[in-house]
Swiss-Prot record:
<feature type="short sequence motif" description="Nuclear localization signal">
    <location>
        <begin position="50"/>
        <end position="55"/>
    </location>
</feature>
<keyword id="KW-0678">Repressor</keyword>
<feature type="compositionally biased region" description="Basic residues">
    <location>
        <begin position="51"/>
        <end position="66"/>
    </location>
</feature>
<dbReference type="GO" id="GO:0005634">
    <property type="term" value="C:nucleus"/>
</dbReference>
<dbReference type="InterPro" id="IPR006779">
    <property type="entry name" value="S1FA_DNA-bd"/>
</dbReference>
<comment type="function">
    <text>DNA-binding protein that specifically recognizes a negative element (S1F) within the RPS1 promoter.</text>
</comment>
<keyword id="KW-0805">Transcription regulation</keyword>
<dbReference type="Pfam" id="PF04689">
    <property type="entry name" value="S1FA"/>
</dbReference>
<keyword id="KW-0539">Nucleus</keyword>
<feature type="region of interest" description="Disordered">
    <location>
        <begin position="51"/>
        <end position="76"/>
    </location>
</feature>
<dbReference type="GO" id="GO:0006355">
    <property type="term" value="P:regulation of DNA-templated transcription"/>
</dbReference>
<keyword id="KW-0804">Transcription</keyword>
<dbReference type="GO" id="GO:0003677">
    <property type="term" value="F:DNA binding"/>
</dbReference>
<protein>
    <recommendedName>
        <fullName>DNA-binding protein S1FA2</fullName>
    </recommendedName>
</protein>
<comment type="similarity">
    <text>Belongs to the S1FA transcription factor family.</text>
</comment>
<keyword id="KW-0238">DNA-binding</keyword>
């Protein structure tokens, strides 16, 4: 009786991979592919796109920065 039970387990184990493992491998593969694609696009953008322009400073902020540096502001 015990030989029948172990033979049944051997057939089930030899059947194939665990479905949970397959799902895990597929999700892991997609995640790795996504990360590699993001890195490749990032490197491409660094080489080919111009640098971002800074936002223009308002006149108040410009005056404040110049006063901090000790540069006389024109018009005052």
């Amino acid at each position: 009786m015990s030989s029948d039970g172990s033979a049944g387990k051997a057939v089930v184990e030899a059947k194939g991979l665990n479905p949970g493992l397959i799902v895990l491998l597929v999700i892991g593969g997609l995640l790795v592919t996504f990360l590699i694609a993001n890195y490749v696009m990032y490197m491409y953008a660094q080489k080919n796109l111009p640098p971002r322009k800074k936002k223009p400073l308002s006149k108040k902020k410009l005056k404040r920065e110049k006063l901090k540096q000790g540069v006389p502001v024109p018009g005052e």
